[in-house]
UniProtKB/Swiss-Prot annotation:
Residues 430-449 have a biased composition (Gly residues). May play a role in the integrity of hemidesmosome and the attachment of basal keratinocytes to the underlying basement membrane. The 120 kDa linear IgA disease antigen homolog is an anchoring filament component involved in dermal-epidermal cohesion. The chain crosses the membrane at residues 469-489. Homotrimers of alpha 1(XVII)chains. Interacts (via cytoplasmic region) with ITGB4 (via cytoplasmic region). Interacts (via cytoplasmic region) with DST (via N-terminus). Interacts (via N-terminus) with PLEC. Interacts (via cytoplasmic region) with DSP. Residues 490-1431 are extracellular. This is Collagen alpha-1(XVII) chain. GO terms for cellular component: basement membrane; collagen trimer; extracellular space; hemidesmosome; membrane. The lineage of its organism: Eukaryota, Metazoa, Chordata, Craniata, Vertebrata. GO terms for molecular function: extracellular matrix structural constituent conferring tensile strength. Residues 1418-1431 are annotated as: Nonhelical region (NC1). Glycans are attached at N1230, N1356. Its main location: other.
Length: 1431
C-alpha cells in the first residue's frame, strides 16, 4: 500500500510516502539434509542438486528532495528467496511448515522539528519468537532516537513527551533477542541512526519457535528462519560492538547469519536495510572496513552476497562521505531475503495473506541534527547471481532518483526477468568507501555518474538500474521483428485473399457457363424432339396410320433416349450470332466460403516499448473547491488588546481671552477633538456642526472574553394543563384480590325450591371434621327446607395424603339420567383439615334449619380442600375471580346432616351472605352449592384428587339450612332452604382427598350429566380427546353395535324417503345426511332414545358416545345401506352454523349479571351437613340429587347452562364447529363442538361433559354418541351435531368422528332419550322437533373427561378449569358485587367446618359488602374493589 502524504513544515513542502508492505513467507518444507555448502563463493556445491530461487520485490517510494537538499524517501524490499541454505545447521524437517509474515509500514522521514509527526517513527509491531524483554528494545531505542534527534539541538524533549512515547505501546511488540551489541548508543548529532529490527525466530536445533508473544496483539506467529542475532550453532558472534545494533531486516548486520563468526570491525551506523554493510551473509567473513556513515539505505554496500565479498564502494557522486544530505540517491535495497536467512528452507510466498503484525521499522538518518534521510529516492535491488542461482526473479520498484527539487519522483516499475551475472551485480568500481548501488542504481537514477561504468541503463531509462542497454536493444529488435513479421503476415494474407478471390471468380464463371450449356442443350433437345414427323413418304408406305404412329412413338422414344445419352449430339455448328442480351439473371447464391487459410504464425513479439520517462509534474491543479466550513474552532484566547498606545494627552492650551461670540460660521466639518483646553468660560453655543461622515468601520476587535453567564431566566409559566388523555385501554384484570371480608349475612333469601333429591350416596365414614371455616355472615334465614336426613356424622378421617385425582365422580340424578362426570376439582385434595362440613352427604337429612343469616360459611369441607388443593378448584377459581364460587346452588339436594367429620356438603347455599367466598371449600361445599360450584363458572375442576380414604359415614349433619336458602341466595334458582343443599359430597371422610375427590367426582358427574354436559358442551371448549375411546358401551353396558345403528339409520332413511344412490353415497354423504335435522332427531329419538345414564366411562372413550367412532358409524351405515340397497339423496347443505357457544367474556359478564348474581351470590350459610354419606362424594351428591333431583338438577343445569356460567365455563369459545344448522346456542356449540371436536376424539368428552354429551360420562370420547360434541345432542344439537357426537363431528367434520363414536354397543334409544331429556330439561332442545325423554338410563360410568371447550385440553372439565385457572388465574369476572344473596334459607346446622381449603386463587379482595342484603354487599365490595383495580 503506498500512501503519499504532503505536509508543509517550516514553509517547506514535504511529501511523505507511507509504504506498507505485507510479506508472508511460508516455509513448507526443508531441503534435504544433504545439501551442505562450504559457504564460499561457489554455492554450487550444494548437495542434492538444490536450486536457488530468488524473488526480490522492492517497493521503493521515490525520494523527495526538499529545500534542504536531503532526499526523503524510503524503500523496503521484501524478497523471497527460495533456496537451500548453504551451510545451515538446521536439520531437515520436510513436514514442517514455516510461515513468516511481515507487515512493514514505513513513514517518510521527517524534518528536524519535534512536531507531532516529526519523528520518523515507523510503527512496528512484530512477534518474534526470540526472548523478549519487558519493553521491546525497538521501542526503547526508538524513543531514545526520537528524543535525541527530533530537535535540532538534540536536546531531550520534555518528560511528558517521553512519557507519551513510552505509553504508546510499551510492550505491544516483542523485540528480538538483544545482541550483545544491541545497546543503542545515544546517537550524536550529525550521525546517522539506523535501527531496523528484524523479527526472527530463534531457531535452534531445527525447532521453530513461533510463540506469539503478546496475546493482546492479533495472534500472529512470526518466525523467521534466521537465527535472531544469536549464534546458530556453536558459532560465536565475535563482533565488536556494532553501533546502534543494526538488525538488518534480512541479515543481521553484525550477526553471523549462518552461524559463521563475523569478525567484523564494528560497522558504522550506516543503515543498510538490505544486506547490512558489515554482515557476512553466507558465513563469509566480511572483513570490510566500516562503511562510511552515508545512509546507503539499500545499497548492499559491503555485504558478501553469496559468499562473495562485495567491495563495492558507493559511487562518490552519489554520496559524499561526510554529508549525507547531499543528493544521496543511493539505492535502497532491503532484501528481505530468506537467502540471507536460513536458506535451507524452501519458503513459499503467500501474497494474499494479510499480515497479522506490523513490523515497525524505524529508519532515521540524522544529518547535522536537521535532516533525516530515511532512504534514498532510488531503490534498486541487486540481483545476486551465482552459478548456483538458477533462477532469479526480481521486481524492483525504483523511483527516479534524479535530484529534482520539489518534484516528487513517481514510482516506476520495471520487471526484469532473466539472469544477471555476478559481474553485473558486482560493481568493482573502486570509488567510495561506502557501498554504492551495485548497478549504479543510485548513480544513474540520481544523475550521478557513479552508477557503474558499464552495465547501467542509460540515464533516460525510467527504471534506473533494472535494465541495461542491450536489453533495450534486444527489446527493440524483438519489436521490429514482431512488426516485420506482422507486415509479412499481412502481405501473405493479402496475397492469399487475392488468390482466393480469383479462384472464386473463376468458379463463378465456370458455373455460369455450365448453366448456360445445360440450358442450351435442353433447348436443343426439345427442338430435336419436335423435329420428327411423319413424312409424306411414310404415309404412302404400307404401314397404316396406327402402325406409323407406333413406329413414330418408338423411334421418338429411342431418339429421346439416345439424345439423353448424348449419342445423337452432332458436332457443334457454327457459332450463332450473339443473341440479344437476356434479362439480368438473379443474383447467384453466394459461393460457399472457402476453406479458411491456415493460421499465420504468430509474429514475433515486439520489443517492449521503453517506459516513458517520468513526466514533468503536471501544472498545479486549480484551487480545489472551498472545503466545507470546518467546525467552529475553540474560542480563541482573547487577543491582546488592540495595538496602539493611547496618545499622550495633549497639553491644554492656554485659556485665551474670551472672544466675542463670532457670527456663527457655517458648521465646518467636525474637527478632531482637540485636547481639551483649559475650560474657558462657556462660549455661546455655536450652531451644531454638520454631522461628520461616518468613519470607516474599525477593524473588528478580537472577541472579548466571554461574559459571565447571565442570570438564569425566570422560570416560564406553567403551561396550560394538557388535554386529558384518552382513557387507556382497559388494563388486564388485576390479580384476583384476596377475598374481602365476609359481608354481613344478608337476609335469608326465599327458600330455594328443593332440587330433586339426589340419590342418596353411601354414607361416608365421617371424615375428620374439617376446621370450621370462618362462617360466612349468616344469610337471612331462608325458608327452612326440609331437613335432609341427617347423615351419620362421619368420624373425621385424618386427612389422607392427596391421592391421585380420582376419576370424576358421577352425579346420579334422581331421574337416573346419565351421570355427568364432572371432573373433580383437580389436584389431590389437600390434607384433611379438621372435619369439613359433614362428609359425603348421606341421604339428604331433613332440611337443615335455615342458616343463620349469612352466617359465615364454614370453610368448605374437605372436598373444598381438595379443590383448593388441586389449586384450581372451580370454586376457588370462581372465588378468586370474585365470582362467588358458590354459584347458584345446583338444585340442592336435601342437605344431609353434616357428617361429623366431613363437612357435609353445605346445604343448598344459603343466600350467599358471605363475602367473597372463601377459597372454595371442599368440593362438598361446592357441591353443596352444587350450583354454587357452578355458580361461579366453576373453575375447571381440577382433576379429582385421589379419592381419600373413605371417611366414616358422617353423622348426618344437622340438617343444613334448608337448601332453599342457599339456593335462593346462590343461584338465581331459589335454593330450597328446606332440605339442606345436597350434602356436600363428603369425600371419603377419611381424607380430604377423598372428600375432595368425591366432590370432584360429584361435580364431574354433575357436569357430565346431560344438562350440565349440554350446558358445558356449549360452553366448554372442544372436549379434549378423551382417552382412547373405550368401546362404545350402551347404557345397558352392551357394546355399541354400529351395524345396528347403521341399520336403524338406514331404516329411518328409507322410511324418510331419502334417495341417494348407494353408488354415489360416500361417508361424507352419509355424514351429511346424518347431520340433517330430521336424521338427528331420528337418531336422537329412536336410535339414541332417551339418554340413558352415562355409560361407564370409556377408556378415553369409555362413554358410549366417547368411543363412538363416527367414521366407523358412517361406514357401517354405508355398508348397511349398500346391503339394504338404500340410497340417500345428497345431503342438503349444512344448516347455518349454530350460534357460537357462550364466550368466556360472555360467561363472565353473565356471571356478573344480575340474573346470575344470585347464583354466584355468596352461598348461604351451608345447610346443616347432611348425614355423612358413604365416602363417595358422588353417592352423597347422588343422594342429594336423588332427593332433590328435580330442583338439584334443574338448579345445577340452570346454573351451568346459565349464560353466565356457560360463558365462564366456556371461557373463550372453543373453535366453532362446522356450521351446523342453526340451533340453540348450546346445540350450536355442541354441534360445532361435535363436529369439530367430534373429529377430535377429545372433544367428545369434553363435549360430553361440556357439550352435554348425552351420556355424560358415556361420552368418554366425548363424543360419545350423545356426547360428541353435539353429543347426542350433537344430533340434538343440531343439524350439526351430527350424529350425536358425530354431530358436528361425525360428519360434521370428520367422518372419523364417527369412528370415534360408535365402537361399542350403544343403546341409542336410551341415549337419545337421555340426551333429549336432558336437553329438554335444560330447554336446549325446545326448538327441536322431538321431545322424547326416555326415562333416564342408569348413569353409565363416567366417561373420560372431555376437554372443556374453555380450556381445550383433554381432561376433566374440572381439570381443565383448574388448569385454566392455574394458568390464567381465576377468571376474574370483574368481581361482581356480591350477588344478592338468595333468600337466605334458614341457616342449616352448620356442617362440621371442613378444613379451610387452600384459598382459591385470591379473588380480588372485595370490599366488605354491606351486611345482609343477600350478600350483595360482599359482592359489592368486591366489585368496588375490582372497580378500583380496573383501569
Amino acid at each position: 500500500m503506498d500512501v503519499t502524504k504532503k505536509n508543509k513544515r517550516d514553509g517547506t513542502e514535504v511529501t511523505e510516502r507511507i509504504v506498507t508492505e505485507i510479506v508472508t513467507t511460508r516455509l513448507t518444507s526443508l531441503p534435504p539434509k544433504g545439501s551442505t555448502s562450504n559457504g564460499y563463493a561457489k554455492t554450487g556445491s550444494l548437495g542434492g542438486g538444490s536450486r536457488l530461487e530468488k524473488q526480490s520485490l522492492t517497493h521503493g517510494s521515490s525520494g523527495y528532495i526538499n529545500s534542504s537538499g536531503s532526499i526523503r524517501g524510503n524503500a523496503s524490499t521484501s524478497s523471497y528467496r527460495r533456496a537451500h541454505s548453504p551451510a545451515s545447521t538446521l536439520p531437515n524437517s520436510p513436514g514442517s511448515t514455516f510461515e513468516r509474515k511481515t507487515h512493514m509500514t514505513r513513514h517518510g522521514t521527517y524534518e528536524g522539528s519535534s512536531s507531532g509527526n516529526s519523528s520518523p517513527e515507523y510503527p512496528r509491531k512484530e512477534l518474534a519468537s526470540s526472548a523478549t524483554r519487558g519493553r521491546s528494545q525497538t521501542r526503547e531505542s526508538e524513543i531514545r532516537v526520537r528524543l535525541q534527534s527530533a530537535s535540532p539541538s538534540t536536546r531531550w524533549t520534555e518528560l511528558d513527551e517521553v512519557k507519551r512515547l513510552l505509553k504508546g505501546s510499551r510492550s505491544a511488540s516483542a523485540s528480538p533477542t538483544r545482541n550483545t551489541s544491541s545497546t543503542l548508543p545515544i546517537p550524536k548529532k550529525g550521525t546517522v541512526e539506523t535501527k531496523m529490527v528484524t523479527a526472527s525466530s530463534h531457531s535452534v536445533s531445527g525447532t521453530y519457535d513461533t510463540t506469539a508473544l503478546d496475546t493482546n496483539l492479533p495472534s500472529h506467529m512470526w518466525s523467521s528462519t534466521l537465527p535472531a542475532g544469536s549464534s546458530m550453532g556453536t558459532y560465536h558472534n565475535n563482533m565488536t560492538t556494532q553501533s546502534s545494533s543494526l538488525l538488518n531486516t534480512n541479515a543481521y548486520s553484525a550477526g553471523s547469519v549462518f552461524g559463521m563468526p563475523n569478525n567484523m570491525a564494528s560497522c558504522s551506523p550506516t543503515l543498510l536495510p538490505g544486506l547490512s554493510s558489515c554482515s557476512s551473509v553466507f558465513g563469509m567473513q566480511n572483513n570490510l572496513a566500516p562503511s562510511s556513515s552515508v545512509p546507503a539505505h539499500g545499497t548492499t554496500t559491503a555485504p558478501t552476497a553469496y559468499g562473495v565479498k562485495k567491495n563495492v564502494p558507493q559511487p562518490p557522486t552519489v554520496t559524499s562521505t561526510g554529508v549525507s544530505t547531499s543528493a544521496t540517491c543511493t539505492t535502497s535495497v532491503q532484501s528481505d531475503d530468506l537467502l540471507h536467512k536460513d536458506c535451507k528452507f524452501l519458503i513459499l510466498e503467500k501474497d494474499n495473506v494479510p499480515s497479522k503484525k506490523e513490523m515497525e521499522l524505524l529508519i532515521m538518518t540524522k544529518d547535522s541534527g536537521k535532516v533525516f534521510t530515511a532512504s534514498p529516492a532510488s531503490v534498486s535491488t541487486t540481483s545476486f547471481s551465482e552459478d548456483t542461482l538458477k533462477k532469479e526473479k526480481q521486481a524492483a520498484y525504483a523511483a527516479d532518483a534524479c535530484l529534482k527539487a520539489d518534484i516528487n519522483g513517481d514510482l516506476n516499475t520495471v520487471s526484469t526477468k532473466g539472469k544477471a551475472t555476478s559481474v553485473e551485480n558486482h560493481n568493482y568500481d573502486r570509488g567510495g568507501g561506502s557501498g554504492g548501488g551495485a548497478r549504479g542504481g543510485g548513480g544513474s537514477g540520481g544523475g550521478g555518474g557513479g552508477g557503474g561504468t558499464w552495465g547501467a541503463a542509460p540515464a533516460w531509462c525510467p527504471c534506473g538500474s533494472c535494465c541495461s542497454w542491450w536489453k533495450w536493444l534486444l527489446g527493440l529488435l524483438l519489436t521490429w521483428l514482431l512488426l516485420l513479421g506482422l507486415l509479412f503476415g499481412l502481405i501473405a494474407l493479402a496475397e492469399e485473399v487475392r488468390k482466393l478471390k480469383a479462384r472464386v471468380d473463376e468458379l463463378e464463371r465456370t458455373r455460369v457457363q455450365y448453366f448456360e450449356d445445360k440450358t442450351e442443350r435442353s433447348s436443343k433437345d426439345r427442338l430435336l424432339g419436335d423435329m420428327p414427323g411423319v413424312g409424306p413418304g411414310l404415309g404412302k408406305a404400307e404401314l397404316d396410320g396406327h402402325s406409323q404412329e407406333a413406329i413414330w412413338l418408338f423411334v421418338r422414344n429411342k431418339l429421346m433416349t439416345e439424345q439423353e445419352n448424348g449419342n445423337l449430339r452432332g458436332n457443334p455448328g457454327p457459332k450463332g450470332d450473339m443473341g440479344s442480351q437476356g434479362p439480368k439473371g438473379d443474383r447467384g447464391l453466394p459461393g460457399t466460403a472457402g476453406i479458411p487459410g491456415p493460421l499465420g504464425h504468430p509474429g514475433p513479439e515486439g520489443p517492449k516499448g521503453q517506459k516513458g520517462s517520468i513526466g514533468d509534474p503536471g501544472m498545479e491543479g486549480p484551487i480545489g473547491q472551498r472545503g466545507l466550513e470546518g467546525p467552529m474552532g475553540p474560542r480563541g484566547e482573547p487577543g491582546p488588546p488592540g495595538s496602539g498606545e493611547k496618545g499622550d494627552r495633549g497639553i491644554a492650551g492656554e485659556q485665551g481671552p474670551r472672544g466675542l461670540p463670532g457670527v456663527p460660521g457655517s458648521v465646518g466639518p467636525r474637527g478632531p477633538n482637540g485636547s481639551p483646553g483649559p475650560q474657558g468660560p462657556p462660549g455661546s453655543t455655536g450652531p451644531q456642526g454638520l454631522r461628520g461622515e461616518v468613519g470607516l468601520p474599525g477593524v473588528k476587535g478580537d472577541k472579548g472574553l466571554a461574559g459571565p453567564p447571565g442570570p438564569k431566566g425566570d422560570q416560564g409559566e406553567k403551561g396550560p394543563r394538557g388535554l386529558t388523555g384518552e382513557p387507556g385501554v382497559r388494563g388486564l384484570p388485576g390479580a384476583v384480590g384476596e377475598p374481602g371480608a365476609k359481608g354481613a349475612m344478608g337476609p335469608a333469601g326465599p327458600d330455594g325450591q328443593q332440587g330433586p333429591r339426589g340419590e342418596q350416596g353411601l354414607t361416608g365414614m365421617p371424615g375428620t371434621r374439617g376446621l370450621p371455616g370462618p362462617s360466612g355472615d349468616p344469610g337471612k334465614p331462608g325458608v327452612t327446607g326440609p331437613q335432609g336426613p341427617q347423615g351419620l356424622p362421619g368420624s373425621p378421617g385424618r386427612p389422607g395424603t392427596k391421592g391421585e385425582p380420582g376419576a370424576p365422580g358421577r352425579v346420579m340424578t334422581a331421574e337416573g339420567s346419565s351421570t355427568i362426570t364432572v371432573p373433580g376439582p383437580p389436584g389431590p385434595p389437600g390434607a384433611m383439615g379438621p372435619p369439613g362440613p359433614s362428609g359425603t352427604p348421606g341421604p339428604a337429612g331433613p332440611a337443615g334449619l335455615p342458616g343463620q343469616t349469612k352466617a359465615q360459611r364454614g370453610e368448605p369441607g374437605l372436598a373444598g380442600d381438595s379443590f383448593i388443593s388441586s389449586g384450581s378448584s372451580i370454586s376457588e377459581v370462581l372465588a378468586a375471580q370474585g365470582v362467588d364460587l358458590r354459584g347458584p346452588l345446583g338444585p340442592p339436594g336435601p342437605r344431609g346432616p353434616p357428617g361429623p367429620s366431613i363437612p357435609g356438603p353445605p346445604g343448598p347455599r344459603g343466600p350467599p351472605g358471605e363475602g367473597v367466598p372463601g377459597p372454595p371449600g371442599l368440593p362438598g361445599s361446592f357441591l353443596t352449592d352444587s350450583e354454587t360450584f357452578f355458580s361461579g363458572p366453576p373453575g375447571p375442576p381440577g382433576p379429582p384428587g385421589p379419592k381419600g380414604d373413605q371417611g366414616d359415614p358422617g353423622v348426618p349433619g344437622t340438617p343444613g339450612i334448608p337448601g332453599g336458602h342457599s339456593h335462593g341466595e346462590s343461584s338465581s334458582t331459589t335454593y330450597r332452604q328446606g332440605p339442606p343443599g345436597p350434602p356436600g359430597p363428603p369425600g371419603p371422610p377419611g381424607s380430604f382427598s377423598s372428600s375432595g375427590q368425591d366432590i370432584q367426582r360429584y361435580i364431574a358427574e354433575y357436569m357430565q350429566s346431560d344438562s350440565i354436559r349440554t350446558y358445558l358442551s356449549g360452553v366448554q371448549g372442544p372436549p379434549g380427546p378423551p382417552g382412547p375411546p373405550g368401546p362404545v358401551i350402551t347404557i345397558t353396558g352392551e357394546t355399541f353395535d354400529y351395524s345396528q345403528l347403521a341399520s336403524q339409520v338406514v331404516s329411518y332413511l328409507r322410511t324418510s324417503g331419502y334417495g341417494v344412490s348407494l353408488s354415489s353415497a360416500s361417508s361424507e354423504d352419509i355424514l351429511a345426511m346424518l347431520r340433517r335435522n330430521d336424521v338427528w332427531q331420528f337418531l336422537r329419538q329412536h336410535l339414541v332414545g332417551p339418554p340413558g345414564p352415562p355409560g361407564p366411562p370409556g377408556v378415553g372413550g369409555d362413554g358410549s358416545l366417547l368411543s363412538l367412532d363416527y367414521g366407523e358409524l358412517s361406514r357401517h351405515i354405508l355398508n348397511y345401506m349398500s346391503s339394504s340397497g338404500i340410497s340417500f339423496g345428497h345431503p342438503g347443505p349444512p344448516g347455518p352454523p349454530g350460534l357460537p357457544g357462550t364466550s368466556y367474556e360472555e360467561l363472565l359478564t353473565m356471571l356478573r349479571g344480575s340474573d346470575y348474581r344470585d347464583i354466584i351470590g355468596p352461598p348461604g350459610p351451608p345447610g346443616p351437613p347432611g348425614p355423612r354419606g358413604p365416602p363417595g362424594v358422588s353417592a352423597a351428591l347422588a343422594t342429594y340429587a336423588a332427593e332433590n333431583s328435580d330442583n338439584f338438577r334443574s338448579e345445577l343445569i340452570g346454573y351451568l347452562t346459565s349464560p353466565d356460567v356457560r360463558s365462564f365455563i366456556i371461557g373463550p369459545p372453543g373453535p366453532p364447529g362446522p356450521q351446523g344448522p342453526p340451533g340453540d346456542s348450546h346445540l350450536r356449540d355442541n354441534y360445532s363442538w361435535g363436529s369439530s371436536s367430534s373429529a377430535r376424539r377429545g372433544t367428545a368428552y369434553s363435549s360430553s361433559v361440556g357439550m352435554g354429551g348425552a351420556n355424560g360420562g358415556s361420552l368418554g370420547e366425548g363424543r360419545t354418541f350423545g356426547t360428541g360434541d353435539g353429543g347426542p345432542y350433537g344430533t340434538d344439537i343440531g343439524p350439526g351435531g351430527g350424529y350425536g357426537a358425530a354431530a358436528g363431528g361425525i360428519y360434521g367434520t370428520d367422518g372419523d368422528s364417527f369412528r370415534a363414536g360408535f365402537t361399542g354397543d350403544l343403546d341409542y334409544n336410551k341415549l337419545a332419550v337421555r340426551v333429549s331429556e336432558s336437553m329438554q330439561r335444560q330447554g336446549l332442545l325446545q326448538g327441536m322437533a322431538y321431545t322424547v325423554q326416555g326415562p333416564p338410563g342408569v348413569p353409565g360410568p363416567q366417561g373420560p373427561p372431555g376437554i372443556s371447550k374453555v380450556f381445550s385440553a383433554y381432561s376433566n372439565v374440572t381439570q381443565d378449569l383448574m388448569d385454566f385457572f392455574r394458568t390464567h388465574g381465576a377468571i376474574p369476572g370483574p368481581p361482581g358485587q356480591k350477588g344478592e344473596a338468595g333468600t337466605p334459607g334458614p341457616k342449616g346446622d352448620r356442617g362440621l367446618a371442613g378444613q379451610r381449603g387452600p384459598p382459591g386463587p385470591p379473588g380480588p379482595r372485595g370490599q366488605k359488602g354491606d351486611k345482609g342484603d343477600k350478600g350483595d354487599q360482599v359482592y359489592t365490595g368486591r366489585r368496588r374493589r375490582s372497580i378500583a383495580i380496573k383501569p
